[in-house]
Amino acid sequence: MNRIASLILICGLVLLFMISCGPKKTKEQLYAEALQFEKQENFKEAISTYEQLINDYPRAIFADSILFKIGQIYSNNLLDFENAINAHKQLIKKFPESKFNAQSLFMIGYHYANSINDTTMARQYYEKFLKIYPEHELASSVQWELDHLGQDINEIDFLKTGTFEETNQDSGNPKPKNTN
């Protein structure tokens, strides 16, 4: 009798486990759920759901944009710059042809320079950016960051005076430059 009771108990537990697992959520369901968490400003749950989406659907065509989004949430909402850097590094490693790689390289360098104060690592990533993406729209920003790497923002001349001028090579006259 004891043996039959054990068998019934095991079968019941297996059945309960199978029912509780339920069907796997679709990528659309997970994405909608993560967006909802973001709207509710529950950023840790949003990241967790985005990570589940990437783990469950690693070949989804938008997986690279999800990793970029995770990096942005860590950076902008949680101020967790180490994890932001890790998300951007993961994006570059997993998706070497992603359209987000240039932005991710920039963000890695930016966080090392401005959030973590590791100018050696910042320089490494900024130089890598310029080598790979010399014509990218962010290249001038990267060059500016490199030119002012390690400087206190309050000691940069044009920021103290509120004007940013560069010498015009042709005439020698100062040429206003857009700071945006």
Q: What are the language-model segments listed below?
A:
Residues N2-A5, F17-N180:
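Acidic, polar-rich low-complexity tracts and alpha-helical solenoid repeat scaffolds
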Residues A5-L13:
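Sec-dependent signal peptide hydrophobic core
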